[in-house]
Amino acid sequence: MSKSALLVLEDGTVFRGISIGADGSAIGEVVFNTSMTGYQEILTDPSYSQQIVTLTYPHIGNTGTNSEDEESNSIHAQGLVIRDLPLLASNFRNERSLSDYLKSQNIVGIAEIDTRKLTRILREKGAQNGCIMAGDNLDEALALDKAKEFPGLKGMDLAKVVTTAETYQWKQGSWTLLDGLPEAKDDSELPYHVVAYDFGAKRNILRMLVDRGCRLTVVPAQTSAEDVLAMNPDGVFLSNGPGDPEPCTYAIEATKTFLDIGLPIFGICLGHQILALASGAKTVKMKFGHHGANHPVKDIDRDVVMITSQNHGFAADEATLPDTLRATHKSLFDGSLQGIHRTDKPAFSFQGHPEASPGPTDAAPLFDHFIELIKLSVNEARSA
């Protein structure tokens, strides 16, 4: 028999449903994601730290879960909100039902609520703090108090919370249908050494860099520029991650150093915002952010439209871009800035997720541009 659950927003709105995860409570910023598939990748994306994820597609859990689709070692979303959990999970890769997966990691979830109504509230009022309670002892008043007590993501440095504790090497490429996840590549197959800052990095980003010949040294978020330069990298990657970029002064200062010496830099999501801040631009908190796998973005340089995967609640403010930065991509949903490129340095970034997982791969050529910048830099160093 299903246990009861409730979701209470900070404005006092109450949704009652059934529990699909662990007993207990979860507090965070409630956001909505419009992806139809990829719920396991979404849950394990560290960028969702301190957020309760509402999935707008009505049927979630159809394909179960498996060990190969995780984007990190654990679920990072605070809680999950869905309309309907199918009785059966059917897929040849299924290892565990979504409900069991949530319970195994002590994650609270709620189903059988009106997610359309919830999404309209978030769209019109903006992202709200909320509290999910699940189990036998549900207390609306207590849940409301907890939701109101949550400080919000503005000013919250979460990159140093979700980052790796130790530096490590990554040499594994992408999953394929026939072979699954491959063995780590030999150094002889990886001609470029890239140091990747882990602000909450997704595994598929690392895999796509390896696919293009990068031997990755993944370092903690607070690693100094001096320590990175001692590793003699051919380029630096600034990963995605959760929270507000402005408090990440350690990353901003390190990026300034890399810019000064002309090291190739590629940033994604939070890394995009950090590059913007290091270059003199400002960032802003968005009303409800972009979360989904169907966001149209215009590539200004190529004059084409890409369908992209998005997951961010902050954005670089185009009005504050200095002369050394030019806009390269814009959202066709709200006109917000989606990409920048330094005019004087081999550095660029993208707000969306070119690695997808889940989502389309229209923006994957951005990885190729990073390799082009690395090749130019390496050739210039050799001829100097």
Swiss-Prot record:
Q: What is its EC number?
A: 6.3.5.5
Question: Where does the signal sequence lie?
Answer: none
Q: Cite the PROSITE patterns for this sequence.
A: GATASE_TYPE_1 (PS51273)
Binding-site residues for L-glutamine, renumbered to this chain:
47, 241, 243, 270, 273, 311, 313-314
Which molecular-function annotation in GO is an example for this chain? carbamoyl-phosphate synthase (glutamine-hydrolyzing) activity
Pathway this chain belongs to: Amino-acid biosynthesis; L-arginine biosynthesis; carbamoyl phosphate from bicarbonate: step 1/1; Pyrimidine metabolism; UMP biosynthesis via de novo pathway; (S)-dihydroorotate from bicarbonate: step 1/3
Span list, region CPSase = 1-189
Please give the SMART domains that the UniProt record associates with this protein: CPSase_sm_chain (SM01097)
Q: Broadest EC class? A: ligase
Q: Please give a single GO biological process term from the UniProt record.
A: glutamine metabolic process
- Superkingdom, taxonomy of origin: Bacteria
Q: Which UniProt keywords apply?
A: Amino-acid biosynthesis, Arginine biosynthesis, ATP-binding, Glutamine amidotransferase, Ligase, Nucleotide-binding, Pyrimidine biosynthesis
The UniProt catalytic activity note for this protein reads:
hydrogencarbonate + L-glutamine + 2 ATP + H2O = carbamoyl phosphate + L-glutamate + 2 ADP + phosphate + 2 H(+)
Tell me where in this chain the Glutamine amidotransferase type-1 domain is found: 193-380
Q: Where is the active site?
A: 269 (nucleophile), 353, 355
Keyword Amino-acid biosynthesis included in the entry's annotation = yes
Q: What does this protein do?
A: Small subunit of the glutamine-dependent carbamoyl phosphate synthetase (CPSase). CPSase catalyzes the formation of carbamoyl phosphate from the ammonia moiety of glutamine, carbonate, and phosphate donated by ATP, constituting the first step of 2 biosynthetic pathways, one leading to arginine and/or urea and the other to pyrimidine nucleotides. The small subunit (glutamine amidotransferase) binds and cleaves glutamine to supply the large subunit with the substrate ammonia.
Family the UniProt entry places it in: Belongs to the CarA family.
**Record note on quaternary structure:** Composed of two chains; the small (or glutamine) chain promotes the hydrolysis of glutamine to ammonia, which is used by the large (or ammonia) chain to synthesize carbamoyl phosphate. Tetramer of heterodimers (alpha,beta)4.
Report the HAMAP family cross-referenced here: CPSase_S_chain (MF_01209)
Q: What is this protein called?
A: Carbamoyl phosphate synthase small chain
Ranked from the top, the taxonomy reads: Bacteria, Pseudomonadati, Pseudomonadota, Gammaproteobacteria, Vibrionales
**Which gene specifies this protein's sequence?**
carA
